[in-house]
């Protein structure tokens, strides 16, 4: 078992090596668009009739074959996601086959089904990690946001996974439906003793809303910034938050991020360079949030598809205005943000600009208010 303290270092080293060699180190496999929840901001969830109209899910044999080809090309890490991957009755056929290939398999799940026989099978053959999306701090919020009173069940399942020694992380998306629960969610993560990642920027769901760029079930830029600042206040040491505010005020914030942009440059993250996303119906994308460029490994074979995806990703150019912006260190801008907000990779995402301005303003104000309180 890999020590978790060295995992980020190991992953970064492998992806850096993969970039030099043109290898697909990480693959994201979107096993299904189906889900037992009905969250309004989801970027992939489709009803069965929509799936039938658009195509069909890949079979277990097809997923396993693609994984084998990807592994032979260099893939080490694989993430099984959805929709909710556990709604597939053949999930463990796919999962065990990938484990037997020697892949480091992680799982994204809403956590509601991880009990009974499913939990037993995960304990017997543990994944590298399970990432649980936590959508609120109460059953009431879950009913409003997901259509089900699932909070207690999800929390119980997270505790059971942790008790079994399985690495669990919580992913939290803040929307108009659960904004009021942020502190309660943080407290629950602390009680469970699990790492939590929060985001308040929501990509427009262009893959399921008919290409309505810039639209989405999300907070206003100011509200999204408010949630981000509150999260920083909750998680950062006072001196770290103060330094962050100072850097923002000087427009010189530098932070470690997976997605970054340079002036007149292309994609700055791993998407399409050392990582890829397979959709439920067999398309390969650089990132699950992007509608294109798309290639088709079922028809082309994985090697050719990967080479074409890398080449197409290399042609993407982001807004020069974003790359030269002094605020970009505090901004969520990336290729996926640009395309989902504007319909163009080189379009300036005004929502992200407004959110960044508000994040800087509110962070600086919060730091000054805290300083005054400490002096009193």
Task: Please tell me what each predicted stretch does.
Residues 1-129:
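Conserved alpha-helical substructure of the radical SAM core
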Residues 4-13, 18, 23, 45, ...:
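Flexible mid-to-C-terminal extensions adjoining Fe-S/redox cofactors in radical SAM and related proteins
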Residues 26, 272-273:
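Short coil/loop residues immediately preceding or within conserved phosphate-binding loops
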Residues 38, 74, 126, 166-167, ...:
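Short loop/turn motifs at secondary-structure junctions
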Residues 48-57, 143-150, 340:
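Short glycine-enriched, charge-decorated loop/helix-capping segments at active-site entrances
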Residues 58, 89, 149, 177-180, ...:
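Residue-level signal for the nucleotide or nucleotide-sugar donor/cofactor binding architecture
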Residues 103, 275-276:
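Generic short beta-strand
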Residues 124-271, 277-285, 289, 293:
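Radical SAM enzyme [4Fe-4S]-AdoMet core and its adjacent flexible, acidic
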